[in-house]
């Protein structure tokens, strides 16, 4: 079962990356739970809820209308109804500048679906 769950989580991560790269904010927030809480690599304040998350994504797109978000070397750990995805990420901006970092998504099973209840992104040092 863990392999199947891992595949589901990785599919959600790929779908989110595709949505971000297409500027599709509803698609980018689709895998997140309504009660989502997280930390961004660009602001110190905690992000709470889907509206705040959508606002954060819109801020990124306002700064660089064309960007390419990628995740590399993802790993998924499954523990019952919780799964944790850790990965390295990069964002290439329209200017050609690339930003690198690390990310964690904590997923919880909600019925038959997996939803992100927490994320933590940080830039590489």
Put a short name on every predicted segment:
Residues 1-30, 37-125:
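A beta-strand edge to alpha-helix "cap/lid" segment located at domain peripheries
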